[in-house]
């Protein structure tokens, strides 16, 4: 009996452990609305951040129906340390340290969409690039420093550290090519990323990603180039 219990616990442990193989040419698929399906990403750097860039692809048909979380980075002091969120009828919401700015767009995302969001504390300049095109730069949380030891979640919006999810904020669709740097990429570098290049991500590296899956999330070949 004890041996059977040990085997069961071992299988459960392996089913929930970090994937060490990376996600090259793959994507996470969230097939239905939920408040318990998500992916937790393990950061390579665990330190306060004075700047960052996050780039990723996402694909969903929710954009005309409701809002949804694209990227959620929480610390114990601030659950919206970084939040990328699509707000229906408004556009892209970009939050740092709990403060929010809106990037209005004329085209609603219906195809696989590439996003890059960058921010730096020294100037407070926040940038959002959509499919290789820059939005107008805006000011956000100048002088702020992001806390360390983050909980990084795909598929849900964290309303507390690592939890408090809501179905109506969940992503239904695909997300992939999530990379993060601890500095603001230049326009030339972002264009290179959009064209398929890379610049050795040092916070999150999709090719060497470690993560934990919870709930109904599947790993499938990516649907974008």
UniProtKB/Swiss-Prot annotation:
Tissues expressing the protein: Found in plasma.
Residues at which Ca(2+) 2 binds: 159, 169
S-S bonds: 55-116
Residues given in the record as Ca(2+) 1 binding sites: 80, 158-159
One of the record's GO cellular component terms: extracellular space
Cofactor remark from the record: Binds 2 calcium ions per subunit.
Cofactor: Ca(2+)
Subcellular location: Secreted
InterPro entries from the UniProt entry: ConA-like_dom_sf, Pentaxin_CS, Pentraxin-related, Pentraxin_domain
Signal peptide (from-to): 1-20
Reported induction: The concentration of CRP in plasma increases greatly during acute phase response to tissue injury, infection or other inflammatory stimuli.
Sample GO molecular function, one term: metal ion binding
Keywords in alphabetical order: Acute phase, Calcium, Disulfide bond, Metal-binding, Secreted, Signal
Transmembrane intervals: none
Subunit structure: Homopentamer. Pentraxin (or pentaxin) have a discoid arrangement of 5 non-covalently bound subunits. Interacts with FCN1; may regulate monocyte activation by FCN1.
Protein name: C-reactive protein
Source organism of this protein record: Oryctolagus cuniculus (Rabbit)
Lineage: Eukaryota, Metazoa, Chordata, Craniata, Vertebrata
